[in-house]
Amino acid sequence: MRFTFSNDLGTLFTIILAIGFIINLVLAFIIIFLERNRRTASSTWAWLFVLFVLPLIGFILYLFFGRTVSARKLNKNNGNVLTDFDGLLKQQIESFDKGNYGTDNKQVQKHHDLVRMLLMDQDGFLTENNKVDHFIDGNDLYDQVLKDIKNAKEYIHLEYYTFALDGLGKRILHALEEKLKQGLEVKILYDDVGSKNVKMANFDHFKSLGGEVEAFFASKLPLLNFRMNNRNHRKIIVIDGQLGYVGGFNIGDEYLGLGKLGYWRDTHLRIQGDAVDALQLRFILDWNSQAHRPQFEYDVKYFPKKNGPLGNSPIQIAASGPASDWHQIEYGYTKMIMSAKKSVYLQSPYFIPDNSYINAIKIAAKSGVDVHLMIPCKPDHPLVYWATFSNASDLLSSGVKIYTYENGFIHSKMCLIDDEIVSVGTANMDFRSFELNFEVNAFVYDENLAKDLRVAYEHDITKSKQLTKESYANRPLSVKFKESLAKLVSPIL
């Protein structure tokens, strides 16, 4: 009896392995042939490695983290929202191709090729009537956000990766509910994974007052989200079509420095002016993509005439996501780095880009450009941290100055060149932000803002340690092992 049981068990195990092997062969075929235009070579090899080293587990991981997104499904509900902006983009492209840049701004004229490239995206139209303020502290940011919510007159739209309903989240939700009582339109779009501790039931009172709330790529089954790999990492607020926010801060007490990582250093922009139209457009397209309610159509109230001359900061909003082969933000960063003549200042909590991005940084440094990169000194995601540390260290031999921020956790996503142009937003300098997640950045052609953020960066350096070739060479063997493991799977982190 025992012998029969053993044989049966062995047969069952063999069948399971055979099924797993067949499934992996099918997935390998899909990854190599059917998804070849949606993946980099390094990503393809990394997934093949996972599938064949971990046959059954690899299949499960692929279901959650390996599937790609259909652009057709995402864009099917756009309606007539894009009509006016398609015309504006076409007009600006034609003007730039003729050498007519439509502005006296020196930075736009000097970097017209960057502007022209960013015009290739539906959000990328150039606006000039803008006033920009920046925030590097979460308390200062959300004090201002709450004031702006209180002063809203017609509507408030929020789109966030993380909307934690802790102290800060409850304060913001209460402020929004007060505006609902005054008859305003209020919509919240949060990411289902980034806000994993939030339930739709938490918004029952908000919805009873007339508020609308949706979860991006919401899971249809408890604890099972097969779109876990493609998250909406954007952070956008639009108020009355006049005022917008974009940057790295999520909503939650952690971002006020009250979490386990300590002080939270990030960068966020408050924009008044015509660039708010691009943030509004992005919110509407993302809202419509979820298709669970009546869709937005074009309405002049969402794109109103702005309240007079506000400033002279030219801005382009760049969005990127897995449904497009054109990685707008990555290419924008890369173009900036390759255009730099004097200096490049980079900040990113995760630094796992592809070789072309790393080579652009090396080329800039070896061309005599003063290149700085700042990363965290502590991990919030261990494997990601060690891949970041390894990639950053690879730049040392090219003359790049590497800093680890010691005063808490740095979450800022910033690229700044020559004290002339700065990009701030949600996109980390990694494969996930460049290709897998939905991201949004502002590219600002404003010397004053660029210089202010460079001064803030230099202050950050005083709270950082500079990584040297010597200190990196003397790292412990355990660190070398972690780096090697992390780098092996970094294309799918």
Swiss-Prot record:
Q: Which InterPro entries match?
A: Cardiolipin_synth_Firmi (IPR030874), Cardiolipin_synthase (IPR022924), CLS_N (IPR027379), PLD-like_dom (IPR025202), PLipase_D/transphosphatidylase (IPR001736)
CDD domains the UniProt entry points to: PLDc_CLS_1, PLDc_CLS_2
User: Can you quote a single GO CC term?
Assistant: plasma membrane
Location of this chain's protein in the cell: Cell membrane
In its UniProt record, a GO molecular function of this protein is: cardiolipin synthase activity
Q: How does it sit in the membrane?
A: Multi-pass membrane protein
Q: Which residues form the PLD phosphodiesterase domain?
A: 228-255, 406-433
**Keywords, alphabetical:** Cell membrane, Lipid biosynthesis, Lipid metabolism, Membrane, Phospholipid biosynthesis, Phospholipid metabolism, Repeat, Transferase, Transmembrane, Transmembrane helix
| Reported function | Catalyzes the reversible phosphatidyl group transfer from one phosphatidylglycerol molecule to another to form cardiolipin (CL) (diphosphatidylglycerol) and glycerol.
Recorded protein name is Cardiolipin synthase 1
Q: Which organism is it from?
A: Staphylococcus aureus (strain COL)
Highest classification ranks of the organism: Bacteria, Bacillati, Bacillota, Bacilli, Bacillales
